[in-house]
């Protein structure tokens, strides 16, 4: 079906039949499936080996070195390695039910930080009488704390002058 080339080292092209072709034998199908499963297994084994032994700073640097050495000395001693970034999950277990993925947790933290910032910097919370109940309660506590501290400072000044 294909013409031969006279050039040295050239081989005629091989016509491959798709797996669904009636020309493909069962042995060829089995060999292709085996090759695909071998490739998938080797990829999974490589991923497991990377996950099984990540290099983390806490595993490599002893705590005595962290406490006793300066940052430059630590960099000189351990800075030539590549390390995995490791995030500690500090969310309460109850929140794990509501937000099982890391993306959901990060979105929640981002949203609550933006919400707190917008509440804090909103003009209504800066005007007396326009604040919400929570802001009013916090402002009352701040004022009470300030008056108590001022009384202690006044007492200290009186005792110091006497």
From Swiss-Prot:
Main location: host cell
Keyword tags: Host nucleus, Viral genome packaging, Viral release from host cell
GO terms for biological process, alphabetical: viral DNA genome packaging
The keyword Amino-acid biosynthesis is annotated on this UniProt entry: no
InterPro entries: Herpes_TT2
Pfam families the record matches: Herpes_UL33 (PF03581)
Compositionally biased residues, Polar residues: 43-52
Localization of this protein: Host nucleus
Region annotated Disordered, chain positions: 1-58
Domain of life per record: Viruses
Function: Component of the molecular motor that translocates viral genomic DNA in empty capsid during DNA packaging. Forms a tripartite terminase complex together with TRM1 and TRM3 in the host cytoplasm. Once the complex reaches the host nucleus, it interacts with the capsid portal vertex. This portal forms a ring in which genomic DNA is translocated into the capsid.
Homology family: Belongs to the herpesviridae TRM2 protein family.
Assembly: Associates with TRM1 and TRM3 to form the tripartite terminase complex.
Name used for this protein in its record: Tripartite terminase subunit 2
Gene that specifies this protein: TRM2
């Amino acid at each position: 079906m294909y013409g031969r080339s006279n050039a040295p080292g050239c081989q005629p092209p091989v016509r491959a039949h798709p797996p669904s072709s009636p020309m493909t034998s069962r042995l060829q199908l089995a060999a292709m499936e085996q090759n695909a499963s071998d490739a998938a297994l080797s990829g999974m084994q490589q991923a497991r080996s990377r996950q099984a032994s990540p290099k983390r700073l806490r595993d490599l640097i002893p705590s005595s070195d962290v406490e006793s050495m300066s940052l430059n000395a630590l960099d000189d001693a351990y800075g030539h390695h590549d390390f995995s970034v490791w995030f500690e999950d500090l969310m309460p277990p109850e929140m794990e039910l509501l937000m099982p993925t890391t993306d959901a947790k990060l979105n929640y933290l981002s949203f609550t930080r933006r919400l707190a910032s917008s509440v804090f910097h909103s003009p209504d919370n800066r005007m007396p009488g326009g604040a919400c109940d929570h802001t009013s309660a916090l402002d009352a506590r701040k004022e009470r704390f300030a008056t108590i501290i001022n009384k202690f400072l006044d007492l200290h000044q009186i005792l110091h002058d006497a």
